[in-house]
Amino acid sequence: MITEQNLEKFRVQCENIFTQIGRDVIGQKEVIEGAVIAMIAGGNVLLEGVPGVGKTRLVRSLGRVFDLPFSRIQFTPDLMPADVTGTNIIVKGDDGNSTFEFQPGPIFSNIILADEINRATPKTQSALLEAMQEHTVTVMGVSRKLEEPFFVLATQNPVEQDGTYPLPEAQMDRFMFKIIVKNPSLDELMDIVNMTQKTMAEVADAACNGDDLLEMRKTANAIPVATEVLKYAMMLCSATHPDSECASEAAKKYVRLGASPRAGQALISAAKVKALMNGRYNVSYSDINELAFPVLRHRMKLTFEAVAERVSADEIIKMIIDELVEKTKIKDEKSAAPVVTATAEETTAVDEGENKKRKLFGRK
């Protein structure tokens, strides 16, 4: 059961998180929001952007703000799987006998920064697969559980591709979001330069801890989703498949392989968090449409025709959404989705939900 106290606590914690991150990272509002949503929802994040736009700084700031142990792994072509997961070493005891002792690798932390992940070989990249999905690490036949909460936040440079190894579909699918980190605006760039002239120190303080984060996730998971909204979200994911009964014309022309069921899971989990952040009891169609881009852009394999015409994944997603909105005759508004009350027992009109939201968050 969701109470007003739960929602108020969630709101205050989110405000504190964004405030503290903002002390370290200037601008990048959408990037910060996406990373926080994914972490609360329990997903991994792939940050893609050119060097110098603050990807690594953001991840380090997240570690401090959530007060969680942080490990950085710099991926290079000579990095081996054992350098990530750890390995057994021979240790001689006091009695003179030698035994194997496990030496944990940097993966045994709560927040993992996989810096320039596409520079490592596929063999090393695959060392993250089990950890990202099952939150376990198997070395020499022995599985070890990773401490919760556990996140992988990876970075990659989309421009410099020489000597890199594109991530395989199996690993890309394990990232809840792929977030594009853009260059700062002129005003943001001026603020960045002014700040760094004074100090380069990262000053964010802890806003919550691991237990708080798990509690926020539990609160978000309890948010109900209206059947109509859930069906719309699943239709959107299915519409990315060119051979699906829900296939859009854009997918038939430009998509070779659509999103997996993980996309649907990620979309709903993230939409619940976003609804709470916006002070609503319900997941709306707009939540689904906005989050479709980071959830789907890395899960679609494009056709040669799309590459030749330079049609991006985001443009295809926009076409699919427009076609689906027209097909289902829904309004792309937050008020289009049914609202479920805090008791999760009755469905009320949207106006009631909006009034409760204003009351909770002190908005006029």
Name each model feature, range by range.
Residues 1-2, 243-364:
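C-terminal engagement/docking regions of AAA+ P-loop ATPases
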Residues 6-11, 24, 164, 178-250, ...:
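Conserved C-terminal "switch" segment of AAA+ ATPases
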Residues 8-53:
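Pre-Walker A (pre-P-loop) alpha-helix and adjacent loop at the N terminus of AAA/AAA+ ATPase modules
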Residues 34-36, 91-113:
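Conserved alpha-helical scaffold flanking the Walker A/P-loop in AAA+ ATPase domains
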Residues 36-77:
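Walker A/P-loop
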Residues 50, 84, 155:
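P-loop (Walker A) phosphate-binding loop of NTP-binding proteins
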Residues 91-95, 120-124, 132-223, 272-274:
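Canonical AAA+ ATPase core
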Residues 115-116, 127:
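Walker B catalytic acidic pair
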